[in-house]
From Swiss-Prot:
It comes from Bacillus thuringiensis subsp. konkukian (strain 97-27). The keyword Manganese applies. The lineage of its organism: Bacteria, Bacillati, Bacillota, Bacilli, Bacillales. Disulfide bonds: none annotated. This is Probable cytosol aminopeptidase. The active site is at residues 272, 346. GO terms for biological process: proteolysis. Mn(2+) 1 binds at residues 265, 342, 344. Its EC number is 3.4.11.1, 3.4.11.10. The keyword Cytoplasm applies. It catalyses: Release of an N-terminal amino acid, Xaa-|-Yaa-, in which Xaa is preferably Leu, but may be other amino acids including Pro although not Arg or Lys, and Yaa may be Pro. Amino acid amides and methyl esters are also readily hydrolyzed, but rates on arylamides are exceedingly low; Release of an N-terminal amino acid, preferentially leucine, but not glutamic or aspartic acids.
Length: 494
């Protein structure tokens, strides 16, 4: 699909950057020779806009071998960022998709500045080509035909091999993020814990990873009472899923991802209202993020050791379901007083984290659609983070900045630990109250990470979008897939 060339050839569409300070850049001047100065007139008349994310279409009318040019406004160079580029190109690829373009090219060097080199631009272009044109997978009987972009050419004076590599990496990042989106969007009667495990096994086998899928009996033997408690009310069997990627000869410096895999959450006996229950098929967004990251890792083969653990079940009501006031024993041996059955994700993660440590994880990053509290605190565009290790958090933060997936650190104070340890009947309680809800949830999970370096990512606000945006339609976003993969790719770098 991707090609790299030094000269412009025949294409259906060519994408060109426009900055406010350089309305007559060398790229525009060169094109304007064929247009006999008409582009300059369009710029002066503001028919070609340099405003951020403005897209201006110009037909060549036979003056060149290119059918249409799409000029992409990027605003001022001083405010030009990777986020600006991602949004602008995402919108551009949506426009090309709507026009049913099958052969497009990008004047890569027109997007290059002192801040962003050609490799950065190539990576982002290939990544957002997939993200921006992602289409919601539905179960409607009337299927519409979709025209795909079949050929995408980067026009650049830079080294072709390096640009091709960047295009490939970007494409893999975008495709894997879309894989995660599709998982999150699937209905709960289709994506059960069993189906999620089957998907994970297929992924592991495709990329030659080791894997384990623990059944209920094995979980009982290992004492995974927290996950099993959440599963008590369900007719669907629980799964503890583990994918193991060995990127080094020695099993050291193992990064452990733990993704919440609650395939549907009614709240259990602490029942959600109807409006709060609709959409809870997406409560396995953390699991999807982890699997998406493992798809990237399997494709690109970084020299790191990685474990992905997914505790999976649904949380439903029945005569056998767990109840408020129950006391359960986790895999770690710590006992938990259940004060809220709708705080089930942290219970599943507790056993997931302990199992990841048992498999050899030296660093832990858990990802979960955990609390509504984080949405109140940070909104729908920022993931909440907590940690017991600032050095590890800094690496996660740097990865998130590279991928433009915003995160913000929330605190853990000793008084927060005291609140989750406040129980007359057990070592911990799973829900100290609504105050500081997001912090309480993360603090609870940290009790199981113990001294292992750990970062908690609450994606409740970022996992899904209520409306269409530059990088995709309404629905699942694939939050943290690219950040997790980038963390692994960059791990340990100075």
């Amino acid at each position: 699909m991707f090609q790299v060339q030094k000269e412009l050839a025949s294409h259906e569409a060519v994408v060109v950057a426009l900055f406010e300070e350089e309305k007559t850049s060398s790229f525009v001047q060169e094109l304007d020779k064929a247009f006999e100065g008409q582009l300059q007139v369009l710029l002066e008349e503001k028919e070609l806009s340099t405003k951020k994310k403005a897209i201006s279409k110009v037909h060549s009318l036979g003056k060149t071998d290119v059918k249409r040019y799409y000029f992409v406004g990027l605003g001022k160079k001083e405010s030009y960022t990777t986020e600006t580029l991602r949004s602008a190109l995402g919108k551009t690829f949506k426009t090309l998709q709507a026009a049913k373009v099958q052969d497009a090219a990008i004047l890569l060097d027109s997007f290059v500045t002192e801040k962003l080199d050609a490799i950065d631009v190539a990576h982002i272009a290939a990544e957002v080509q997939g993200l921006g044109t992602y289409e919601l997978q539905t179960y409607k009987s009337d299927k519409k035909d979709r025209v795909e972009l079949e050929k995408f050419t980067a026009i650049t004076a830079e080294d072709a091999q390096e640009i091709e590599a960047a295009l490939t990496v970007g494409y893999v990042h975008g495709r894997a993020t879309n894989s995660a989106r599709t998982l999150v969007n699937m209905p709960p009667n289709v994506l059960t814990a069993t189906k999620l495990a089957e998907y994970a096994v297929e992924l592991a086998e495709k990329y030659d990873m080791d894997y384990k899928v623990l059944e209920k009996e094995e979980m009982e033997e290992l004492g995974m009472g927290a996950l099993l408690a959440v599963n008590q009310g369900s007719i669907e069997p629980p799964k503890m899923i583990a994918l193991i990627y060995k990127g080094k000869e020695e099993w050291t410096d193992v990064i452990g991802f733990v993704g919440k895999g609650i395939t549907y959450d009614t709240g259990g006996y602490s029942l959600k209202p109807r409006e709060g229950m609709v959409g809870m098929k997406g409560d396995m967004g953390g699991a999807a993020a982890v699997l998406g990251a493992m798809e990237i890792i399997g494709e690109l083969r970084p020299e790191q050791n990685v474990i992905a653990v997914i505790p999976s079940t649904d949380n439903v009501v029945s005569g056998t379901a767990f109840k408020p006031d129950d006391v359960i024993t986790s895999m770690s041996g710590k006992t938990i007083e259940v004060l809220n059955t709708d705080a089930e994700g942290r219970l599943a993660l507790a056993d997931g984290i302990t199992y990841a440590k048992k498999l050899g994880a030296n660093y832990l990053i858990d990802v979960a659609t955990l609390t509504g509290g984080v949405i109140v605190a940070l909104g729908n565009h920022t993931t909440g983070a907590m940690t017991n290790n600032e050095e590890l958090f800094e690496q996660v933060l740097e990865a998130s900045m590279e991928t433009d997936e915003s995160i913000w650190q929330l605190p853990i104070f000793d008084r927060d630990k005291e609140r989750v340890r406040n129980s007359k009947f057990a070592d911990l309680n799973n829900s100290p109250g609504r105050e500081g809800h997001a912090v309480m949830a993360g603090t609870f999970i940290g009790e199981f990470a113990e001294d292992t370096p750990w970062v908690h990512l609450d994606i409740a606000g970022t996992s899904e979008s209520s409306g269409a945006h530059d990088l995709g339609p309404a629905g699942a976003t694939g939050a943290m897939v690219r950040t997790l993969a980038t963390l692994v790719e960059r791990f340990g770098e100075e």
